[in-house]
Amino acid sequence: MNIVILAAGMGKRMRSALPKVLHPLTGKPLLAHVIETARTMSPTRLVVVVGHGGDRVREMVGAPDIAFATQDKQLGTGHAVMQAVDQLDESVPTLVLYGDVPLTRAETLSALVGAAGNDHLGVLTVHLGDPTGYGRIVRDAAGRITRIVEQKDANETQLAIHEVNTGILVCPTAKLKSWLATLSNDNAQGEYYLTDVIERAASEGVPITSAHPLAEWETLGVNSKVQLAELERIHQRNLAQQLLEDGVTLIDPARIDVRGKLTCGRDVVIDVNCIFEGDVTLADGVRIGAHTVIRDAAIEAGAEILPFCHIERAKVGADSRIGPYARLRPGTELAEDVHIGNFVEVKNSQIAAHSKANHLAYVGDATVGSRVNIGAGTITCNYDGANKFRTVIEDDAFIGSDTQLVAPVRVGKGATLGAGTTLTKDAPEGKLTVSRARQVTIDSWQRPVKQKKEG
């Protein structure tokens, strides 16, 4: 089967410099959703028709299995498909999809393709309570589809029809090519309508069949930011419903955003206003606090993420406790039972089991052993303005509050750094290292007094 995806539209109502099909829905471009669904059908040829912003669309797709055709002038859907016909295999049918209709399920498309077979024309239709703006499906007395009439070309009788065209169709490729060659733009829009091939098929006696989606939202398209926002909420609601059915506890299913792939184990609890981006895995018993953002990360069994945390490209070990207000940056790997507390930032660091940094610390480019205590105000000084250097803190070390570790530097096993230390040389294991000025009390010192302003 050939699949042609129409993605050439300018999207004027989006009021954006970004091509319409590149606007994100649940974290990825509209067109990417359509391509993902198309690939599940294993097409022999997959062609994307581009036009406005074509170079940016090609760059986004960036896949060797996808061919492109260009529609330089926006002269309608029929004209768009004409640009792709030379790349199609005539021995198999062609399915036409739309880059701004992202949520049509593969099962629905398979049903349409199955109903059409190799020699019928198949149309995906839907019944709408308010069909305004859609092409109407016109049937004869026997219920056979005879034509599709666009809104601007419809008479009063046709406008009263509630069965509408979704634009998605499948038909024999050789027939499609011949019908496209006969299309006219003599209509209110001055465009070449793909839907006119229905009338051509009927006149030639080609059987026309139809299929229907299970849900109306499968056929909804995007022509404005309003419609994009509506579709985002619909898709998020569907994703939340699936999570609930899979056994995840959502404190409020209406207040979760999944912008990628979220995989959850058993007894996972997710509080309100959490955002999951990219590929995120939450193992058994994980609890995610409110207002947390997690991107491309794995949270292992029994870990708890307290509210207002930000975790990106990091791994959190089993039974660890993160937050509130903690940030784990790319390259962070935490072993089991690690505590990262409020206003602690960890970047590109490995922290072994049972270690803690409970308050106000920066741990960057560091290797931290087991059972290490990192006091409040500790900073690994990893950057000299040009290069990054690593800090190594071995097992059972104790880092006092307000300590600066100027990398490259090593803290030995069981070593203690006194509060306020600025460490520039390795600290030996099992010993106390302190570097700060001796405390002095000046008896005769007087605090300056502000002078009162006259007048």
Curated annotation (Swiss-Prot):
Q: What is its main location?
A: cytoplasm
Q: Which GO terms describe its molecular function?
A: glucosamine-1-phosphate N-acetyltransferase activity; magnesium ion binding; UDP-N-acetylglucosamine diphosphorylase activity
Cofactor(s) recorded in Swiss-Prot or TrEMBL:
Mg(2+)
Q: Where do the annotations place UDP-N-acetyl-alpha-D-glucosamine binding?
A: 6-9, 20, 71, 76-77, 98-100, 135, 150, 165, 223, 329, 347, 362, 373
Could you tell me what reaction this enzyme catalyses?
alpha-D-glucosamine 1-phosphate + acetyl-CoA = N-acetyl-alpha-D-glucosamine 1-phosphate + CoA + H(+); N-acetyl-alpha-D-glucosamine 1-phosphate + UTP + H(+) = UDP-N-acetyl-alpha-D-glucosamine + diphosphate
Q: Where are the transmembrane segments?
A: none
- What are the boundaries of the region Linker? 226-246
Coiled-coil ranges from the UniProt annotation: none
Classification via HAMAP family? GlmU (MF_01631)
Spell out the protein name for this chain: Bifunctional protein GlmU
Gene from which this protein is expressed: glmU
